[in-house]
């Protein structure tokens, strides 16, 4: 027996030793790969290539294990870049003598989420316009452009259209799934309490169709956004007002021939012909059999090695990205966790080198408790240094709640904001339990609230009154926060609140925001208030991770390829996952939410 245990533990030790050696070797290989990766360079007469098939988020994207292994492949995949990355690359390329133009490629497929939003595309579009002012051309190659992609690409000097191209141009839409019938069929009870007649998040759980109030607000919202999109495209392509929408309505899908005849494109030409033409004009990259080029991510690597215009002072601006649903607790990389964000904002508030905070909001809201946590820290910071808000695709409900703690708010015309309203939602399984012979009984103190949140019992009228009172209290607090933050009378706020969403352009008109502008405008404004000059140092949260942090995440995460090409099955899967995530995010400890649904499709 002694011999057995000796052999057993000896073998076990050997296994652990081998695993340890393998792990050390693995980490060493990864580190060597990082060190030995080819240093990016820019050849003379190069074009900067912007691949819009890759999502462009506001915040640095969640780490993927594929990025760690990218260096093992001779042909590295392009890694996703952020909005600020793209803007920085375009702005530097305008004055870089080696960069002669920009080439836009890839099919931007509208999917659920927050990346590549219209406000982000608008800011990139404006940067491309300034790039053209340096007398450098912008080219675009179009295969199957959806409206957001074409909105961006229409700024190009030359739009090369593939002979097999189909332009899929449609306006924004919303087709929510309604679960009330299914929930009733399966015996699941839903009880709702809300403040704000336009507060539509709960509708799929209690209705079988869209309410008149929600239809009213969405029709107005979509009209504002669509008007901005069509007007911008018509001006860029030299088309008469109203002609773009007329073309779409009369033809549906627009093929390449019609696109060129209608001035949506410059000429029909295959990709190989475009490559040959650009090789002739700018020189050839023999290794890759294409024209001389540098991708945005590679160009950023060059810029990191050759920083320009960064002041020697340690003073800086903190850019905080509130991108995703606001949830209670720490949250994940895809969420805005109330505790985590409040803690980081507190650090920036207490850091004397941080002279201003820019909060980039791209969130539909969420937990009322978490929104208040973040609001308090922002308000405390605003007492000692400028806090400026830049609104992205969404800054609605809880996203707007945290915004009003700031000194100044920037939004884009196509930002979705407002939604000053609150709701609570309780699920009970009383009927399904009864149908299956499950009963419940209880012993409590004299406190009537002891069984308030029993999931087997339907809430009584008295219970509902208690919960409605809590929702009304938070709504009044929301209105008060807006009233004080925006210097509006409570009556004025109530008139434009009620859970109604507004476009950024309308929000500026009714004084929910101060100015029309993007992230760059907000940073410039904050820099001016903090006296940091034209090119302030920036620190970001969430920030980019170093190798040790990436290795930690590698052992916690499932590797997945970067999202570039999306097949129809994956697209449906993402839609279902998005619907489920909406429900899973309802984790407020008090069951009170300031949340706007994100079932809008940008087509």
Locations of regions flagged by a protein language model:
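Short acidic-hydrophobic, aromatic-tinged amphipathic segments that line or gate anion-handling sites
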Residues: 160-161, 265-271, 410-411, 513-518
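Solvent-exposed, polar/charged alpha-helical surfaces in well-ordered, non-transmembrane soluble domains
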Residues: 84, 88-91, 101, 122-129, ...
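Intrinsically disordered, low-complexity segments enriched in small/flexible residues
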Residues: 1-78, 84-86, 173-256, 261, ...
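Surface-exposed aromatic
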Residues: 107-112, 244-247, 501
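Sec-exported extracytoplasmic/periplasmic mature domains
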Residues: 91-98, 129-136, 155-158, 184-188, ...
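Short helix-initiation/N-cap motifs at beta->coil->alpha
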Residues: 144, 249-254, 395-396, 499-500
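Cleft-lining beta-strand/loop regions that shape enzyme active-site pockets
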Residues: 39-41, 46-177, 308-432, 472
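C-terminal structured domain segments across diverse proteins
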Residues: 326-327, 332-585, 596-602
